[in-house]
Amino acid sequence: MSGSQLWAAVLLLLVLQSAQGVYIKYHGFQVQLESVKKLNELEEKQMSDPQQQKSGLLPDVCYNPALPLDLQPVCASQEAASTFKALRTIATDECELCINVACTGC
């Protein structure tokens, strides 16, 4: 294999890896990291706009049509609020996502 073929193979692997995205698994739910980031944005907007806040059993974000599809099944859970909180915590912890090679268990 020549040097240019090796570089092409490495580049292809990097592109494929980044295209797959990062997934978070928690209590039977599997969601994309990008979806959790979108969840944070939606919740921040709802906190700043009292008209978007609902009083119900579900977290307010469950009523938002912009909620990513992979997060919508969480709203059917009785523990939706605590699940969203856990997902946000995991998404901000580099060791949970195995981004930092110094973390153990990755």
From Swiss-Prot:
Q: Which GO terms describe its cellular component?
A: extracellular region
- Family classification: Belongs to the guanylin family.
Q: Which UniProt keywords apply?
A: Disulfide bond, Secreted, Signal
Source organism of this protein record: Rattus norvegicus
This chain's function reads: Endogenous activator of intestinal guanylate cyclase. It stimulates this enzyme through the same receptor binding region as the heat-stable enterotoxins. May be a potent physiological regulator of intestinal fluid and electrolyte transport. May be an autocrine/paracrine regulator of intestinal salt and water transport.
**Annotated InterPro entries:** Guanylin (IPR000879), Guanylin_sf (IPR036382)
Q: Which GO terms describe its molecular function?
A: guanylate cyclase activator activity
What Pfam family is a match, any one?
Answer: Guanylin
Which Cys pairs are S-S linked?
C62-C75, C95-C103, C98-C106
Entry comment describing in which tissues the protein is expressed: Expressed not only in the gastrointestinal tract but also in the lung, pancreas and kidney.
Domain of life, per the record? Eukaryota
Q: Which PANTHER family would you find in this protein's record? A: GUANYLATE CYCLASE ACTIVATOR 2B, GUANYLIN FAMILY MEMBER
The name this protein goes by in its record? Guanylate cyclase activator 2B
User: What are the subcellular locations of this protein?
Assistant: Secreted
Q: Where does the record place a coiled coil?
A: none
Hey, what's the signal peptide range on this chain?
1-21
Give residue ranges for the propeptide.
22-91
BP term (GO), one: response to glucose
